[in-house]
Amino acid sequence: MGKLTILVLVAVALLSTQVMVQGDGDQPADRDAVPRDDNPGGMSEKFLNALQRRGCPWQPYCG
């Protein structure tokens, strides 16, 4: 039982070290490289934004 505990602790230590080392290489080169959410209001706002860009046929609903 003691050997199994040591084995598990060593495995956890190795995996956490690997994750920390690999995580450092993922940084984007620029803050603008991160994709931004154009429609934070969800699907309904996305639909209304698409209608406004094309010329909305339902004027009262298109703000």
From Swiss-Prot:
A single GO molecular function term of this UniProt record: ion channel inhibitor activity
Propeptide intervals in chain numbering: 24-54
Keyword field: Amidation, Cleavage on pair of basic residues, D-amino acid, Hydroxylation, Ion channel impairing toxin, Neurotoxin, Secreted, Signal, Toxin
Modified residues (Cysteine amide): 62
Residues bearing PTM D-tryptophan: 58
Annotated GO CC locations: extracellular region
Residue(s) carrying 4-hydroxyproline: 57
Record-stated family: Belongs to the O2 superfamily. Contryphan family.
Task performed by this protein: Its target is unknown, but this toxin may modulate voltage-activated calcium channels (Cav) or calcium-dependent potassium channels (KCa).
Name this protein carries in UniProt: Contryphan-Tx
Organism the protein comes from: Conus textile (Cloth-of-gold cone)
